[in-house]
Amino acid sequence: MLYHENFDVIVVGGGHAGTEAALASARTGQKTLLLTHNIDTLGQMSCNPAIGGIGKGHLVKEVDAMGGLMAEAIDHAGIQFRTLNASKGPAVRATRAQADRALYKAYVRNALENAPNLTLFQQSVDDLIVEQDRVVGVVTQMGLKFHAKAVVLTVGTFLGGKIHIGMESSSGGRAGDPPSIALADRLRELPFRVDRLKTGTPPRIDARTVDFSVLEAQHGDNPTPVFSFMGKREHHPRQIPCFITHTNEQTHEVIRNNLDRSPMYAGVIEGIGPRYCPSIEDKVMRFADKNSHQIFIEPEGLTTHELYPNGISTSLPFDVQVQIVRSMKGFENAHIVRPGYAIEYDFFDPRDLKQTYETKFISGLFFAGQINGTTGYEEAAAQGLMAGLNASLYSQGKEGWSPRRDQAYMGVLIDDLSTMGTKEPYRMFTSRAEYRLLLREDNADLRLTEKARELGLIDDVRWARFNEKIENMETERQRLKSTWVNPNSAGIDELNKLLKTPMAREASGEDLLRRPEISYSQLTQLDAFAPALEDQQAAEQVEIQVKYDGYIKRQQEEIEKSLRHEHTKLPADLDYKDVKGLSNEVVAKLSEAKPESIGIASRISGITPAAISILLVHLKKHGLLKKGEEE
């Protein structure tokens, strides 16, 4: 049966990737349909109740800078906020927040239900409608057909999902939800490379059965950081602490004695798990010299007694889970509310994607989230926003867009995935970016909001606030540049107290701010340079831009050099066997990867600078280099 309406874009899945994809498409004015197997699970946090962290917080800020929802949602649902690496440089500082699951999910659902151009419908998708290597719609579980110009799949861990607790396994997309078997089978018929990954989650604990008096409390920052560039502290709900406990030798002994009952160690699970979020049994075996591991006890919300023990993800049998939990300090009488489990699922090799998240084999079909081999809510949200945007552009017959590696962590993410692929769940870190000093949390809006406005993602309110911030920054920098003091100026003694060496010559406010020992807030407390900006975001930018000016300029020069041939297009029908001078290995790798540009080709494993030079000579010889690329 054919549904009575056609759509521009269909998004399949209502998790963190799906919600951002649907909202991005709808914000750009496209008629969008979000299909989910259960409307009640929209925006659900399937694993840990937290958003952000090193690298991840950067992605959230970028999603926010492009009009996405995640930062706004966590500002309204966060019950503990912290700035990680606060004592380090601005490039690696990151925001992290504990979430109230119920508040977060409710905020996301409300945003989806009230978004113009967006329709929600509850049905699982079993099939794609493909005509001449182009997707034109989907078929649901009950045979209902929906037609659209573009389809975004954000199916999480549901494709062929299998849940493991001990040696028992069952089909499932996550605990309590059915898997997508028919869709997984259908996708395996298409020419994509497919493999299996696994992830896991810890048992949940009833807080009323825990002795908090023996645990170390971990409080959030005061004042609390804010995630969204439009956020305010008054949006935050009541703040509460987390707690810390540790595993011990007794815990480790329980695990070692029961490894024969672990599906991972017994060879039942084939999928590779996340390197940076290993199960407790994996940690005990891999780090055999450690007799203790730190476990963070995270509240799941303000209106529930459930606790999330971050650090003991496991697929061991339930009776062993009870022993593990009760071996830890403060948990001697703990009651498990939900058992931990591992889940195995299909993912598709992201090297089969273009940089727009469109698949190379099926036009108009986009993948985002764990289907691409990533792990984490933040990575999913970033992919979802970009896939939804590009599906919208595709449906309008416009050229797709994705940021470069030097423009955003979102650019690093898709570039890593589409050029190198992944054999294990991919997680974002600041160390993955070459230009970290430029890709800071604090300047995500300066990097991306203008482009997002051009693409139709930014509303008038956010645009006005962005321009106000830019104006405040420019005015303040000009004020500091043009305000001078000398050794004889009034109040100079107060200034000298802040300096390592007293002033010997005339200096501007900007000259003084470059000194490492003086901060913007200290400088603007002095009569000569008062008052400070009321706009704290603008003030932070002024300080960072002045203090790191030399380093920032150096990185920008490096980027300009590297960009010379970054966007030089490689014809889709180029036969690399016809390019004289390329080795058989290089020909094979380029033929398989089908890179869209010289920049992408240069980052494929095994492609040498010499091979890139040969390609450029070939392009020039055949008149395929644009003016300005030949120098």
Swiss-Prot record:
MF term (GO), any: flavin adenine dinucleotide binding
Any Gene Ontology CC annotation: cytosol
Binding site for FAD: 13-18, 125, 180, 370
Stored Pfam families: GIDA, GIDA_C_1st, SAM_GIDA_C
UniProt-listed SUPFAM superfamilies: FAD/NAD(P)-binding domain
Residues that hold NAD(+) according to the record: 273-287
Functional description taken from the UniProt entry: NAD-binding protein involved in the addition of a carboxymethylaminomethyl (cmnm) group at the wobble position (U34) of certain tRNAs, forming tRNA-cmnm(5)s(2)U34.
Subunit structure: Homodimer. Heterotetramer of two MnmE and two MnmG subunits.
Protein name, UniProt field: tRNA uridine 5-carboxymethylaminomethyl modification enzyme MnmG
Organism: Vibrio parahaemolyticus serotype O3:K6 (strain RIMD 2210633)
Gene name for this UniProt entry: mnmG
